[in-house]
Amino acid sequence: MLQSAEGWIRDFHLDGLRLDAIHAIYDSSARPLLRELAERVHAIRDQVHVIAESGLNDPKVTRPAAQGGYGHDAAWADDFHHALRTLLTGEREGYYAEFGRVGDLAKAYRRPFVNDGTYSTSRGRRFGAPAFDRPVEEFVVFAQNHDQVGNRAFGDRLPAPARPLAAFCTLLSPFTPMLFMGEEHGEEAPFQFFSDHIDEKIAVATREGRRREFASFASFAGEEVPDPQDPVTFEHSKLTGRGDAGLRELYADLLRVRRTLPRGDVDDIVAFDDMGGPQLAVRRGPYTLFMNFADGPVSRVLAPRPNEVVLSTHEARIEGDGAVWLPAQAGALVR
């Protein structure tokens, strides 16, 4: 494994490695494999990015080796996704059951481990650890990815009405954003779970294991869940290139504006749960991200009072009393 990682960087000149499910690697050695891997590839080229997926909410992943960590450059942050998706869609099945409060997303904007040593109801135990010693840039956040879409029974992407606000929340966060293929133009094709196992025993185990893992989701109860081994499942998942030109333009605008925002920790966060639903205000220097997750419009006075809408997902305005008006499921960057 170590030589393979070195080869990808040295011989094939990749600019980074993404390590899958490192929480499933059991290693009690004095010099952990994951630490040595990062050391070896960084020795070849300093600017190589080692990005880990860990289901443990453990800041040790990105801590330097000198501090007892693995020295990876970044780590995925699933809790940010869960906190965001549950507000956008109202889903509460399975591991989403312990999310859904606007306070969860407010906490995630500080550091995206919502479970940071707190009790996890889906796991039945305390989970995670605080990560305030790690800079925000080390956390990779997303509104969709291959796991969160592909692990759904039918591979359905985020509902279209939720996509603009999801993009706003993710791309204007202080963290490192990741886009899922076709997300930026509202790709119409699903991304279903597909496989091509030659061994029938493994194929059967894949089907059964998938249903078992997601048994708490009602959509997995029916017999119509696509068969991972059926070639049609793979064909349905191919990108079409069709989508929403307006959404693509919004993504471009968000990425442009992101470059102007101050780097580092956010300055202030205020969560609201009135006026018909949850809202969140996140201040970054002179800018405030105002997000309305409610099913109806809101008008709220923010502090400090803004006088300009820099960018918004939908129509937004500053009213006479200085309040920011937003329609349902919308976001505005004001200053």
What are these regions (language model features)?
Residues 1, 10, 27-30, 34, ...:
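Active-site-proximal structural scaffolding
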Residues 1-61:
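Active-site neighborhood of glycoside hydrolase catalytic domains
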Residues 1-8, 142, 166, 246-258:
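Alpha-helical packing segments of well-folded alpha/beta enzyme cores
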Residues 6, 10-13, 42, 147, ...:
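Hydrophobic alpha-helix feature that most strongly marks membrane-spanning transmembrane helices
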Residues 30-31, 63, 300-303:
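Short amphipathic alpha-helical segments
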Residues 34, 38-218:
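Conserved alpha/beta catalytic core and glycan-binding cleft of carbohydrate-active enzymes
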Residues 154-156, 160, 169-335:
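Carbohydrate-interacting/catalytic domains
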